Design a protein with these regions (language model features):
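Conserved glycine-rich "GG(E/T)P / GGGxP" loop and the immediately following alpha-helix
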Residues: 55-60, 215-240, 244, 248, ...
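Flexible glycine/acidic-rich beta-alpha junction loops that bind and position SAM and/or redox cofactors
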Residues: 89, 222-232, 263-267, 286-298, ...
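Hydrophobic, well-ordered secondary-structure elements that form the walls
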Residues: 284, 325, 345, 353, ...
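Short, electropositive alpha-helical surface patch
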Residues: 233-246, 266-280, 333-350, 375-380, ...
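Proteins enriched for Cys/Gly/acidic motifs involved in redox and nucleic-acid/cofactor modification
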Residues: 1-228, 267, 276-278, 282, ...
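Terminal RNA-binding accessory module
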Residues: 2-3, 368-470
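Radical SAM/AdoMet-radical enzyme domain recognition
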Residues: 239-240, 247-253, 264-324
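Intrinsically disordered, low-complexity polar regions and short flexible loop motifs
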Residues: 256
Length: 470
């Protein structure tokens, strides 16, 4: 039952990790608000602090633990939720006695009551981890109904309207949860579960709500967006959904993220590359370029396949944005494999390259593989690839000088300069475009036409111009 205003409890919500976690946090904030709670990001005057953790790789786990310990310094009870909490549960609770409770995804529907128990000093059982892939049928088409029956995270439980936690013109919109791929290095499916799509009508309804709150760009997120619809009986559901999202009143741009190269079919490439209102932007999870390394990773493709894919994309959309992440130092990787990765990156002309050093993840196949590379060698290879990537990304930005861009404004300086993102730049994770000579009266969330006149590392500088000159 919702609390009265006088008795309204309060919670600070701290979010770490990826955009999917940001959506989870906003759903939890909306749920708590519907129960009469006040939710804020300021932990200075609240009853409890909730930290939505990330458990993806070693560095993310460390950041989450640091955030949990830091939150305890304000003298309020601290509760861990999110991926790290779901993945490690009681083990995490035992190692961090400073934290009042560790709750898994299955506690989300009853979160308000769990937090009330913590505030009141009542004992709250720590989460017991379970491999969430085992909770759903193997056949994807049977999953949505079963997910609803068992209250699987994000399915069957319809959250209250999200509470947006900032006024950004960009909003993240979740397409699905879970993943069916079995990459040797990745533990995500074990705690996020098997892949389950959200019904298109639900995605559209949330997109309209986000537009009504001031969102101008919708960024679609999931663990694997190319799989969207395979469990709904329509493996091309994303091709049908994108134009409908782009047609929502108030939405200037729709962007798809988390694309698997091996599943990127020609019809989806064409839809992303040519649909009005959809950013010609390809967030491609290559991970490496050596065929041998990729096979050990339990992934498909190789450098030649990836270059062919990029070539096809650029035939349809010559100015398309393309980004990827790569893992360096995977077990068995040789100097020749690293050289092949270097050749691929040089030929790929990517706008953004994320470089990660391999680290063992509990419960993964790769953690048990022979051929481990020592940390010092991995660090040297990471630095080598990162230096090359920085050089290549800077050159790619220089190559865009002279291009016409439409910039979604995120900030307006007192000088009148604007900062935002063009279609080839994803908010928060990619570079930005600074617009000079902008007309007066431009506000955050507006779109400005401009032409690129310079680059600053990966970032661009553009001069505002009339639409017919862009």
């Amino acid at each position: 039952m919702p609390q009265t205003a006088a008795a309204a409890p309060s919670a600070a919500l701290v979010t770490l990790g990826c955009a999917r976690n940001e959506v989870d946090s906003e759903e939890l904030a909306g749920q708590l608000r519907a129960e009469g709670w006040r939710v804020t990001s300021d932990d200075s005057d609240v009853d409890i602090v909730v930290v939505n953790t990330c458990g993806f790789v070693a560095s993310a786990k460390k950041d989450s633990i640091d955030a949990l310990l830091g939150a305890t310094e304000v003298g309020r009870p601290v509760v861990a939720v999110g991926c790290l909490a779901d993945r490690y549960g009681r083990t995490l609770a035992d190692s961090l006695p400073e934290v009042s409770a560790v709750l898994g995804f299955d506690a989300y529907p009853d979160l308000a009551n769990r937090l009330q128990d913590v505030i009141a000093g009542r004992p709250v059982a720590s989460h017991q981890p379970v491999d969430r892939r085992r909770l759903l049928p193997v056949a994807p088409v049977h999953r949505p109904a079963v997910a609803a029956e068992i209250g699987f995270r994000g399915h069957g439980w319809v959250p209250r309207a999200r509470q947006r936690l900032d006024a950004s013109p960009v909003a993240y919109l979740k397409l699905a949860s879970g993943c069916d791929r079995r990459c040797a290095f990745c533990a995500i499916p074990s705690f996020r579960g098997s892949f389950v799509s959200r019904p298109a009508d639900d995605v559209l309804a949330e997109g309209r709500w986000l537009a009504a709150t001031g969102a101008r760009e919708l960024v679609l997120v999931s663990e694997n967006s190319t799989s969207y619809g395979k469990d709904l009986g329509n493996p091309r559901a994303l091709e049908a959904l994108l134009p409908r999202l782009a047609a929502i009143d108030g939405i200037e741009r729709v962007r798809v993220t988390y694309l698997q190269p091996a599943e990127l079919r020609p019809t989806l490439i064409e839809t992303i590359a040519t649909t009005f209102g959809v950013a010609p932007y390809f967030d491609l999870s290559f991970q490496h370029a050596s065929r041998l390394v990729l096979r050990r990773m339990r992934r498909f493709g190789a450098a030649a396949d990836f270059l062919d894919l990029l070539g096809h994309i650029r035939e349809l959309a010559p100015r398309a944005g393309a980004r990827s992440n790569v893992i360096v130092g995977f077990p068995g990787e040789t100097d020749a494999d690293v050289e092949e990765l270097e050749r691929f990156l040089t030929a790929a002309h990517l706008d953004v390259v994320g470089v990660f050093g391999y680290s063992d993840e509990d419960g993964t196949e790769a953690a048990r593989m022979p051929g481990k590379i020592d940390e010092q060698t991995i660090a040297k290879r990471v630095a080598r690839i990162q230096d090359l990537a920085d050089e290549l990304v800077t050159q790619r930005a220089e190559d865009r000088i002279g291009e016409a861009v439409r910039v979604l404004v995120d900030a307006v300086a007192a000088s009148g300069e604007l900062v935002g993102t063009a279609a080839h730049q994803a908010p928060d994770v990619d570079a930005t475009t600074r617009v000079v000579d902008a007309p007066r009266g431009v506000r955050r969330g507006d779109t400005v036409h401009a032409r690129v006149v310079a680059s600053e590392g990966a970032d661009l500088v553009a001069r505002a111009c009339p639409e017919d000159e862009s």
